[in-house]
């Protein structure tokens, strides 16, 4: 039986570093919010069967998203951290029968709204049938420095280093087990949780355009990228 590909967007964060008067996923770039741009990517992709957004129980912006994308599931069961939000989303997918344990969950940052469709297709094609799952990533290009008290303490060898992106694709059952720990401290992405089980996910070539909206100046670059699409 064909595995379903389910996009899961954790959107319960408040984006403190971005400095806006609302969570950054609800900041407007052009005529749409960042989150609406993200949802459009997955809704347009023929290989994605379902898209789910998990927001905070206190979210007051999600109704607009639901109106714009009535076919998207918007769940207000987000947690205090990204890992908790993803865990809650995966658990509900399994509990409701919307996902089987072998279905693929593609977890994607709500602030990465420039994901090229070809990068998404590449991830699904190369990792969609892999038991260990896989993530989009790009080789580290810049020279890395280790700091101590505001000074360089060492230059880090960047050979073999990759910068993780999203989506990160894993079977629902594996992801559920990986996030089942009571203490999720130190889990910064889904791959790091899966790695703790001894699993080594695949690295799939990502795309430099798939940047994450983090600082206010990132909005300028994102706007240019979206206009170029």
Swiss-Prot record:
Protein name per the record: 2-C-methyl-D-erythritol 4-phosphate cytidylyltransferase
SUPFAM superfamilies: Nucleotide-diphospho-sugar transferases
Pathway the protein takes part in: Isoprenoid biosynthesis; isopentenyl diphosphate biosynthesis via DXP pathway; isopentenyl diphosphate from 1-deoxy-D-xylulose 5-phosphate: step 2/6
One Pfam family, short name: IspD
Keywords, sorted A to Z: Isoprene biosynthesis, Nucleotidyltransferase, Transferase
Keyword Calcium: no
Root EC class: transferase
Species: Neisseria gonorrhoeae (strain ATCC 700825 / FA 1090)
Catalytic activity: 2-C-methyl-D-erythritol 4-phosphate + CTP + H(+) = 4-CDP-2-C-methyl-D-erythritol + diphosphate
């Amino acid at each position: 039986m064909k595995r379903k590909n389910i996009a899961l967007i954790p959107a319960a964060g408040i984006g403190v570093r971005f400095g806006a008067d609302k969570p950054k996923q609800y900041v407007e770039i052009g005529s749409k919010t960042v989150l609406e741009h993200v949802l459009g990517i997955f809704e347009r992709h023929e290989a994605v069967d379902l898209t789910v957004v998990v927001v905070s129980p206190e979210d007051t912006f999600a109704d607009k998203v639901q109106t714009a994308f009535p076919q998207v599931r918007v769940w207000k069961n987000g947690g205090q951290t990204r890992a908790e939000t993803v865990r809650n989303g995966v658990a509900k997918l399994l509990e409701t029968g919307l996902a089987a344990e072998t279905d693929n969950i593609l977890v994607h940052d709500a602030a990465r709204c420039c994901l090229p469709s070809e990068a998404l297709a590449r991830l699904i094609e190369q990792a969609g049938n892999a038991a260990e799952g896989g993530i989009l990533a790009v080789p580290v290009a810049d020279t890395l420095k280790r700091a101590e008290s505001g000074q360089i303490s060492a230059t880090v060898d960047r050979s073999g280093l990759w910068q993780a992106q999203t989506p990160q694709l894993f079977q629902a059952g594996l992801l559920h087990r990986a996030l089942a720990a009571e203490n999720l401290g130190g889990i910064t992405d889904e791959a790091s949780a899966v790695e703790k089980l001894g699993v080594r996910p695949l690295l799939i070539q990502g795309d430099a355009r798939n940047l994450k909206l983090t600082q206010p100046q990132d909005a300028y670059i994102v706007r240019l990228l979206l206009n170029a699409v």
